[in-house]
Structure formats: structure tokens, C-alpha cells
Amino acid sequence: MEDMQVEKNTEGSSSSSSNNNNNNSISNEFDLETYINNYSGFTKIHRLIFIADNCKQLEVEAYNMALKEVQKTPNLELYNTIINKSHGILELDPVYIENLSKKNSLQLDKLEQDLNTAKSNMVKDSIRFAQNDLGEFYYKIGDHQNALKCFIRTRDYCTTSKHVLAMCFNIIKLGVDTQNYTHAPSYIAKAEQSPDLDNVSNAKLRSVNGLYNLDGSRYKLAARKFIETPFEQSNVFSDIISPQDIAYYGGLCALATFDRNELKKKVIDDPMFKNYLELVPELRELINDFYNTKYGSCLKYLDKMKPILLLDIHLYKHVEILYQRIRSKALVQYFSPYQSVDMNIMASAFNTTVTLLEKEISKLIMENEIQARIDSHNKRLYARKADQRTTTFEKTVQVGSDFQNSSNSLLLRLEMLNNNISTVSNRKDNERGNWENPHHHHQMQHQMFGLFNNNNKF
């Protein structure tokens, strides 16, 4: 059996996801304790470390909270990471380390002995339980490589679809914690096929699928998966994601990729996603302002929530891309109803200068997103009109050509019927593809049109 690999990450997912700076400033109204209580398990710890690494204002508070949480687990590796990262804020406790090391060693010996006993008894369920317990222990101490091996090995001892579903979720959980989604698609698909998939499991899979697509910058797919996540079950898997996260991820990805009709139908008017938006009123107002072409207000909301989004362990690296796409869409939609626009007024609407706006518009024109030309002297933007005369002529020629081809085909068929001519295909020729031979088809057509021209009575 092939063992699957997981990337080694000695500092948890938080280290690989860091912005590598500590300069993000955030409003004093932000309550870290309220925010972090939306999460549980290692997700909570990794988020605290990420926030401490990237926000000087919250550094001390976040490291202290992370230390308190990690001491509820047997993960010494993560404990050491937090101490080292704190740069003297926290002190190492040698007694705690020694005691926990002994405890972990005894627990590992016991679990390995249980597995060996189960294997010697050759009882499938016992082996699966033992492998799963060992994998769970490795997961808790931060040994993700061995945890993955154990979870994969339970596959050979699964006797029901529920067992398979549990195995899939264990592997998916590892992927989310390490932010390594290599195995996510196959195990999400396998889990979705389970006849025992309940509503909670289905919601969990949708949200994880959303994270997988977000990580791969497939923003439209990510938006769809988050929007499809049932609201009633969204607060029961806080070890992965919070309902507020689903609102932010789904809403921003939708703004960046959905057209107006999709935004109205699948986000604004969707009864299920409305519940998520109620949890984040500013996001709800932002989306409504965008749809109602109140771009100045929309952009102000985006600027206000940006510091919080940059402290999100999954979203931070996509914020600039999503913001740029949303802004570009707003510029295109603002200009689309007009033949010309005063760029001074447009710059005011988008909280920018005419010089910067001109650069943005130039880029959109180069990318063929806006059909327009810029009058730099008068600071006006003019819609580029298509040559209606040429377009009409080309359409007329195409319609005439289509009509001629259709008429010739009809007349040919009528003449063949009048002369009792039919085509019989040879099965072997068909299998070889001779019926598609262009030379054969052209020769036959030439003969038929010759017959048509000689006997034409029309």
C-alpha cells in the first residue's frame, strides 16, 4: 500500500502563511477574544499565532492566548514554536516540557501496543480503531506525516460507508490544518459519494471544498461552494471555519467574479446566504452598495474591513487580488451606461485622483475590459463606437451565405429524390472513417451537382 506524503511544517500552518511583517494596524474596536472564540482546536491556535506574527498591537495578547490553548494539547512542538516566536514575551517551562514528554512517550507506547495486539487478533474493527487512535495521537502532537499514514491505513479495515467517511474527514482535517490541499479533491469526492452523508458532513465538505478552491485562486468555484454551505450546520465545525468566514470568503469571491444577475440571484436574494450576511452587516451593505452602483460607499467599506481580512490565515494572500478585481468591475460597470464621462467626477466617486484613475482606465482599455478612449487634455472618457456600417455589412454577407448553402443543400436533396438516388454507407468504411473523407465527400458532391445542373427543371 502506498503511503501518502504531507509537507513537513514544524510551526503549523501559521508559519507558512505569515505575511512576514508585524506592521498591520487594526481598529481598537476589534475584540480578539470575541473573534477567536469562533474557533476551536488547532485552527484556533494557528490563527492566534498568525495574528501575533502580523499585528504588533495584538502580539502580546495573541501569544498569551495561543500558549494557553496549546497547553490544553500534547503538542510540544507547537508549544516550543510559540515560545520561540514570542521573542521573550513568553518563558519556556522546562518542568512542563519534561512532564509532557514522558506522558507522550507512555501514551505512544500504549497505542502502538494496542495496534500490535489488534493485528495479532486479526479483527478488522479492532485494527481500524487502533490505527485511528494512533493517527489521532500523532495529529495532536503535530506529527502530521505519521498521522496521515495511520489514517490512510485505516482504509483497508473499513467495513461500512461510515468508516470510509470518517477516514476521509480525518485526511481532509490534516490538509486544512497544514494548508496542504494535495489530497483534498479525491477525498472530498469520495466522501460526497457516501450514502451516509448527513447534513453536517455535507456542510463541512462544501466549506472545505471552498477553502481548497480559494487556496488555488479559483475564486468563482470557491464562491459557489461557500454560498452552497447550509447555514443551519455552519456553527458545528469551528475546528475548520466559522460562519463569519463563510460570509467573507463567499461574499468577496462572488463580488470579484459574479456578474450582476448572479450576484443578485445567488448572493443578495439567496435565502440561505442572507443568513451568513446578517452575521457581517458591513459586508451585506458593501455588496448591496456595489449592486446599486454606490461605488464610493462600497470602496469605503472595503477599506475599513481590509485590516481584519489581512489577519485571516486563509484569506490574507488573496485580499489584494480580490480587491483589485472588485475595483476593476466597479470601474467597468460605472462607465458602461455612458457615451462619455468626466474623469474628475469619476475620480471623486472612486476616492482617487484623476492621474491614478487615468492609469487604471488605461490598463482596463489595454486588457479590453473597457471599449473606450481617453481624452487626457480635457480629462474625459469616451465610449469607443463600433463601425455600425461595417458590422451590418458583414452580418448581411453572412446571412446571405448561410441562406445560399441551405438552399443548395435542399435543392440537391430534392434532385436526388427525383432521380431515385440514395447513399448507402458501408459499415466497415464507416468504422474506418471513410464516410468522413473530405476527398470522397467533395467528389460525391461534385457528381450530384453535375446531375442537378443537367436535369434542373426548376
UniProtKB/Swiss-Prot annotation:
Record-linked InterPro entries: CSN1_C, PCI_dom, Rpn7/CSN1, Rpn7_N, WH_DNA-bd_sf
Key word Ligase present: no
PROSITE patterns xrefs: PCI
One Pfam entry name: PCI
Domain of life: Eukaryota
The PCI domain, residue ranges: 218-388
Main localization (coarse): cytoplasm
The protein's assembly and partners: Component of the CSN complex. The holocomplex is comprised of 8 subunits csn1-8. In the complex, it probably interacts directly with csn2 and csn5.
Protein's job: Essential component of the COP9 signalosome complex (CSN), a complex involved in various cellular and developmental processes. The CSN complex is an essential regulator of the ubiquitin (Ubl) conjugation pathway by mediating the deneddylation of the cullin subunits of E3 ligase complexes, leading to modify the Ubl ligase activity.
UniProt cross-references to PANTHER family, sorted A to Z: 26S PROTESOME SUBUNIT 6, COP9 SIGNALOSOME COMPLEX SUBUNIT 1
Similarity remark: Belongs to the CSN1 family.
Full protein name: COP9 signalosome complex subunit 1
